[in-house]
Structures are given as C-alpha cells and as structure tokens.
Swiss-Prot record:
Sterol 14alpha-demethylase that plays a critical role in the third module of ergosterol biosynthesis pathway, being ergosterol the major sterol component in fungal membranes that participates in a variety of functions. The third module or late pathway involves the ergosterol synthesis itself through consecutive reactions that mainly occur in the endoplasmic reticulum (ER) membrane. In filamentous fungi, during the initial step of this module, lanosterol (lanosta-8,24-dien-3beta-ol) can be metabolized to eburicol. The gene is CYP51. One of its GO terms (molecular function) is heme binding. Coiled coil: none annotated. The keyword Lipid metabolism applies. It is an enzyme of class 1 (oxidoreductase). Belongs to the cytochrome P450 family. Keywords: Heme, Iron, Lipid biosynthesis, Lipid metabolism, Membrane, Metal-binding, Monooxygenase, Oxidoreductase, Steroid biosynthesis, Steroid metabolism, Sterol biosynthesis, Sterol metabolism. Pathway: Steroid biosynthesis; zymosterol biosynthesis; zymosterol from lanosterol: step 1/6. This is Lanosterol 14-alpha demethylase. Its EC number is 1.14.14.154.
C-alpha cells in the first residue's frame, strides 16, 4: 500500500516480518514505513554497521527527536546536539556508580516490602504483574534516584502518567509528533504534570540552601555545566529527569514482569532460585541483602539475562542517514534521507545464534559462562573484550555481538 507500506505487519509482528523478509531477500533489505524508507541489516554485522557508524554518516537525533521530544521535553536527549547528549549522560552517571548502587539496595528493599505489605495479604493470591511491576519499579527508582522528598509525593496514579508517556512511542508518533487524538493529549498532560513536579523538587532543593550528594537531583544540580561553560536550565534538568526515570522504569518493569511470568510456568526454576537465595542470605533469610550479595546470585542473574534475550524492550533501533552510506560487502548504497534499522531483539531470538532460541532456558548461560566468563559471547571486532555491567554480570561492549539487550555504541544505555 503506497505511503503506509509495511507499517501494519511490521507494527504488529516485527520479528516475524523480519524473518519473512530475510528468507526472501537475505539479511539486508528495505521496506516502506509510513512514507519513510527503512533499510534493515539483520544480525551482528548489522549491529556493527549501524551502531559503529560515523556521526557524519548517520544521526540518532534526526531519527528520534520528533518521537522523543514531546515525551521527554526540549533541550535534552535527542533534542540537542550529540555532544550535549554525551555530556548529559556523564552528568547522570555521577549518581549511577557502584557506590550509589550499594546505597540504593536497602532503599529498594524497603520500598518493595512496603509495597507487598500494602497490596498483598496471606500466603497466596493473584496480581496483574504488568500493573504491579510498573508501580513497584516507579516507587523504587524514584526513592533511590530522586530521594524521599519526591517519593513521598507519588502514588499509583503517577505510574499511570508514565504509562501515558510511554504510549507516545508508536509508529504513528514516529511520523506525526502532534495530532488531535486522546493518546496525544494524555501524553502531553502527563509530561506537563511530571515536569512541574520535578521543577518543584528542584526549587525545594535549592531553597534548602545545601546541595548534598544523596541522589540524582543533587548530582545534576552540582554537575550540569557543559564543556562550553553553559549550564542546563531547570526546565532541561526536569526533562532529563523524565528521560532517566522513564528509560529505567520502562525497561525494568517490563523485564521484571516477564521474569515473574516465566517463573510462574517453571516451578522447578522457582525452587532453584529459592535455594540459591537461601545459600547467600541464610536458610531463614536472616542476613541483610547487600549489593555484593546480588552479584553472587548466578542463577538469578542468568534468568535476568535469559528474560532480556527473549523480551528485549525495544524491537528496533534506527538512524537517519545524513550522507550516502555504502553497506559493507554489498553493492548497496543507502541514500541520504533514508533510515537504517537493526533489531538486536530479532538476533537474540534467532536459531543461528542461540540453539532452541524460542525456549526459556536460563541454564544456557551456565555453558556460555564457561567461555571467558560469558563476557564476549559471540562478540567480534572493536571493544569485544571491553565490558559493561548492568547489574546481572559483565557483558561485552562490542556491538558485533548477537546479545545486545541494551543496544551499543555511543548511544548504549547508561
């Protein structure tokens, strides 16, 4: 269909769409998405082609700004030059160090216990994990990142506002930043309410007269000066706070929900994990949970890895081509103005890289770990031996890898 192209089938079943196209055309092919030409390169070589592309050849900002700016706000993430985004990530990372995570663990535990005591009764029952994990993640993230002052203002309705923001990421939003439709109105209202809440928190911090080193807000207020000497405005700080919390909340709530759903279908795995936690915290869980304890839970971390492999939060990553771009080892040239697209989620579900790829098998990571600790599993090329740890064990920074749950390259998740 002209203009619409493959938007419907791609939007409904992206991985099946990619596989059908691959069988007909190979790993490199193009399709029309609501008037935009998308050139797809599947597999690790595609990851390397797009994620290691030069800034002069492709632009994440041009690809995403009309989608992300109404959600996050102006002046941050993709509504600014790339060098500013890199600086913003550095500002935020001050509060995302190992030392910070050590401090966050008891806060997260306290929030989870409060949530359980308030919402669950007895020894058994049912819950909607999509709802509970969204709320729980918001409460734990806001408490640890933004402090008690913000956490005390939040209730379940705040999770609904973040859900309204999240619904601003659709193929329709990719083409039209603003339309007179209910989901657009809810997105904009949620952005305004959340932004005003964060601005109020910033003003309260400043009025106190002393900026400490307790949370992300303190870190941003103390460190948000760009290398050219300009300082982020309070509105930009509030917008960056939306982006940081939303990025973590979206990923963590979805992943933890899938984690629990898979546990529900595997009683034996439940028992194994229960015994592993007992081995670390004591038979009656008498020890206080610490950050170091979490690193000892090999099966828990393998289950997280396997959950992310089967359920990557984003099915597509794309860039806008800003200069005619040759595709390596082919005769193809992607013209300026078109888009390049990769799908690490598709690769992680491919039998070419993971035997029995559609099956949930956390113990597959036991075997993978036996090879250089599982760090560079399948990774090739630049940075293959360099690592990053998202909290469930080290993985390679190399982008030519079949396992990229959080993307890679300069736009890799923090």
């Amino acid at each position: 269909m002209p203009w619409v192209g493959s938007a419907v089938v791609y939007g409904m079943q992206p991985y099946e769409f990619f596989e059908n196209c691959r069988k007909q055309h190979g790993d490199v092919f193009s399709f029309l998405l609501l008037g935009k030409v998308m050139t797809v390169y599947l597999g690790p070589k595609g990851h390397e082609f797009v994620l290691n592309a030069k800034l002069s050849d492709v632009s994440a900002e041009d690809a995403y700004t009309h989608l992300t700016t109404p959600v996050f706000g102006k002046g941050v993430i993709y509504d600014c030059p790339n060098w500013k985004l890199m600086e913003q990530k550095k500002f935020a990372k001050v509060a995302l160090t190992k030392e910070s995570f050590i401090r966050y663990v008891p806060l997260i535990k306290d929030e989870m216990l409060k949530y359980f005591n308030a919402n669950f009764r007895g020894d058994s029952g049912k819950t909607d994990v999509l709802k509970s994990q969204s709320e729980m993640t918001l409460f734990t993230a806001s408490r640890s990142l933004f402090g008690d002052a913000l956490r005390n203002r939040l209730d379940a309705s705040y999770a609904e506002m973040y859900s309204d923001l999240d619904k601003g990421f659709t193929p329709l939003n990719f083409v039209f930043s603003y339309l007179p439709l209910p989901n657009y109105w809810k997105r904009d209202a949620a952005h305004k309410n959340i932004s005003n809440t964060y601005l109020d928190l910033i003003n309260t911090k400043r009025a106190g007269g002393e900026i400490k080193n307790e949370d992300l807000v303190d870190a941003l207020l103390k460190n948000s000066v760009y290398k050219d000497g300009t300082r982020m405005t309070d509105e930009e700080l509030a917008h960056l706070m939306i982006g940081v919390l939303m990025g973590g909340q979206h990923t963590s709530s979805a992943t933890s929900a899938w984690f629990l759903l898979h546990l529900g279908e595997k009683p034996q795995l439940q028992e194994e994990i229960y015994r592993e936690i007992q081995s670390v915290l004591g038979e009656n869980f008498e020890r206080e949970l610490t950050y170091d304890d979490l690193q000892k839970l090999d099966l828990v971390n393998a289950t997280i890895k396997e959950t992310l492999r089967l359920h990557m939060p984003l099915h597509s990553i794309f860039r806008k081509v800003t200069r005619d771009l040759p595709v390596p080892n082919t005769s193809y040239i992607v013209p300026k103005g078109h888009y390049v697209l990769i799908s690490p989620g598709y690769t992680m579900l491919s039998e070419r890289y993971f035997p029995n790829a559609s099956e949930f098998q956390p113990h597959r990571w036991d075997e993978i770990k036996s090879i250089d600790g599982g760090i560079s599993f399948g990774a090739e090329g630049e940075n293959a031996k360099e690592t990053v740890d998202y909290g469930f064990g080290k993985i390679s920074k190399g982008v030519a890898s079949p396992y990229l749950p959080f993307g890679g390259g300069r736009h890799r998740c923090t």
